[in-house]
A protein has these predicted regions:
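N-terminal leader/auxiliary helical segments
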Residues: 1-97, 102-326
């Protein structure tokens, strides 16, 4: 997946590209919720107790691979059932950011996995470090290009300054959307995502982004030294955010247009560079936001507005492979 900063930058550009419509007004009004949405289900990857699960209860991982279109359908249904105008707009701003995250992941993630030559039949732990390092490099390059800042000069946590009311609302809204899609109570399932889980995940991503900051590279060197004793493939040290790139820019972004393949389907080969995929992502966001705005302004006397065009534009793709999840 693109990293924290890349998702943020995608969202800023997608917002700036919007015409002066209702959706743009809503996002500007509730920018913190939009910016939280830009991190998508990744917020759950910072919540350590959730990560202990290796099955469908690993919320962030499960959402990346299953019932993707159903989640957006249920999120729109939940939104349409909200009576408060303020809360309806808060949900819309958050959901717009979430959609941007999904689009960026489904388009750019195959590039990341392809470039590190990920093999689906091997343990994911072997590629975690390479994956994180490439994401951090892309973060650093785009941050310098668009903000003229180094990673050490960009406070990720400051992009998530929700107030208490916003945090409480989005915790309730997101938990309802997730449970409606993935965790309805049945004879076989008694697990659900609580408002508290979401709230703790929001806190965790803000806290985690501070912990992972390593401007001078001291943490990276120390943790890397310890990891080298116990691990063949470093993980934690590669996730730390530094100002140093691990390779040359043209290699990181594939500016030479070398061939890479989708690890989940090697018949899908591409020479696309990351800038190519960046433009593709923004084009897709523009189309999705057009239909989302139409959904939000539709005046339907009874029941939710028609969402078929929006759901069709979103598709049903894995956040990891970019392939249809069926």
């Amino acid at each position: 997946m693109p990293g924290f900063t890349t998702h943020y930058l995608f969202g800023v550009k997608a917002y700036n590209d919007l015409p002066n419509n209702y959706l743009k007004h809503v996002i500007s009004k509730y920018r913190w919720l939009y910016q939280l949405g830009l991190q998508g289900p990744d917020i759950f990857f910072y919540n350590v107790p959730i990560l202990r699960h290796r099955d469908y209860r690993n919320v962030g991982s499960h959402m990346h691979e299953y019932q993707v279109n159903d989640f957006f359908k249920n999120s729109l249904l939940e939104l349409s059932e909200i009576r408060s105008r303020q809360q309806k707009e808060e949900a819309a701003a958050f959901l717009a950011g979430f959609m941007c995250h999904y689009i960026a992941d489904s388009i750019c993630h195959p590039f990341v996995y392809g470039r590190i030559q990920f093999q689906t039949d091997k343990k994911k732990s072997e590629c975690h470090g390479l994956h994180a390092a490439l994401e951090n490099d892309i973060d650093a390059i785009l941050l310098w290009k668009f903000k003229h800042k180094k990673p050490s000069e960009f406070n990720q946590a400051a992009s998530l300054c929700l107030n208490t009311q916003e945090s409480q609302f989005v915790s309730r809204y997101l938990s309802r959307c997730i449970n409606r899609t993935y965790y309805q109570i049945t004879e076989k399932n008694n697990f659900q995502v609580t408002e508290g889980m979401v709230a703790r995940s929001i806190f965790a991503i803000r806290f985690g982004s501070r912990i992972l900051s390593d401007p001078a590279g001291h943490k990276t060197h120390l943790i890397g030294s310890v990891e080298s004793i116990f691990l063949k493939h470093p993980i934690a040290s590669k996730k730390l955010v530094t100002d140093k790139l691990s390779a040359k820019v043209h290699e990181i972004l594939n500016l030479d247009h070398e061939v890479w393949t989708n690890p989940w389907d090697h018949s899908i080969a591409s020479t696309a560079s990351f800038p190519d995929l960046y433009q593709q992502t923004l084009k897709k966001c523009n189309a999705v936001y057009y239909y989302l705005n139409a959904f939000l302004i539709a005046n339907v006397p009874a029941g939710p507005p028609d969402m078929s065009a929006l759901l069709a534009e979103l598709g049903n793709y894995s956040y990891h492979s970019g392939l249809d999840v069926g």
